[in-house]
Amino acid sequence: MKAITRILALAMASCLMLAACEKEDGASKNTVTVNGVTYENVVASVDDSRNGLWFNFVLTEDGKTTASALIDDGIALEKTLKYGVDEGNGGYGDWMCLSVEYPDEKIYSVEPKSGTQTIKKQDGGYSVVIDGKDDNGKDFKMNLVAKIVKL
């Protein structure tokens, strides 16, 4: 239950599989490059490209977290996030969502088995809502709101 106490500020457009980080030779630092920017001390990163929405998520050891998404027309969504991860279910190798909301509780790691995804423009950004069911058939809702940033 430790993971449920972790706080997430925002939600992601879809549940994502965490990608492996590349390790630098002779150093303990993990690095990952997103849109030409290299991040060091990376704890976890995500790369997803479903439903025409590309999303990349990077968490660094100092707690700085950057998420960016690319819509098909070349407009980027970018937001700095606060991040928590479900450590009680296999840690960084698991599927995860940001801020999955159940009617009666919050849980931070779930792989949707079914559901619908709606993406719409909203106040200079995009709003993404996923209604779905988790592995146990329990309903959940996931939300992402992000501003538009030119690449």
Task: Name the predicted role of every residue range.
Residues 27-29, 52-54, 123-129:
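Short, hydrophobic/aromatic-rich segments at coil-to-beta transitions
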Residues 119-151:
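C-terminal or internal capping secondary-structure element at the end of a domain, subdomain, or sheet
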Residues 43-122:
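Surface-exposed helix/loop patches within compact recognition domains
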Residues 37, 63-65, 136-140:
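Short acidic/polar mixed-charge low-complexity motifs
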Residues 3, 30-31, 121-122:
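N-terminal cationic leader/targeting segments used for protein routing and processing
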Residues 15-41:
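Bacterial Sec-dependent N-terminal signal peptides
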Residues 1-19:
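Sec-dependent bacterial lipoprotein signal peptides
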